[in-house]
Amino acid sequence: MEKPLFPLVPLHWFGFGYTALVVSGGIVGYVKTGSVPSLAAGLLFGSLAGLGAYQLYQDPRNVWGFLAATSVTFVGVMGMRSYYYGKFMPVGLIAGASLLMAAKVGVRMLMTSD
């Protein structure tokens, strides 16, 4: 029996969950502190991640899109902010989720490279 190329849970579902986490983080940041940059960044990066997840849904081999770029960018940005502030919540949570998403997308890139 041949091993399936893709796992039981498709990557785009993780992408949609990641999108929801990023957007909700921007909204919560705005509601709690009134930070318009937090809202703008959450909506912008969440939209880009959502677009990447949608592209992945349309073509499972298309992992080089917005989802990869957004998660890798957020690992760097939120990781630096978490280190600077010395707190895990909320930026460390987003950095950790972004790291996991970047790792999952990276593994998929290695699996689909021809």
UniProtKB/Swiss-Prot annotation:
Domain of life: Eukaryota
Keywords: Developmental protein, Membrane, Neurogenesis, Transmembrane, Transmembrane helix
Keyword Transmembrane tagged: yes
Transmembrane found in the keyword field: yes
Membrane-spanning intervals of the chain: 8-28, 34-54, 60-80, 83-103
Gene Ontology CC terms: mitochondrial membrane
Molecular functions (GO terms): identical protein binding
Additional detail: When expressed in embryonic mouse neocortex, induces intermediate progenitor cells and outer radial glia expansion, cortical thickening and induces gyrification.
Subunit structure and binding partners: Interacts with IQGAP1; this interaction promotes phosphorylation and nuclear translocation of IQGAP1.
Protein name as it appears in the record: Transmembrane protein 14B
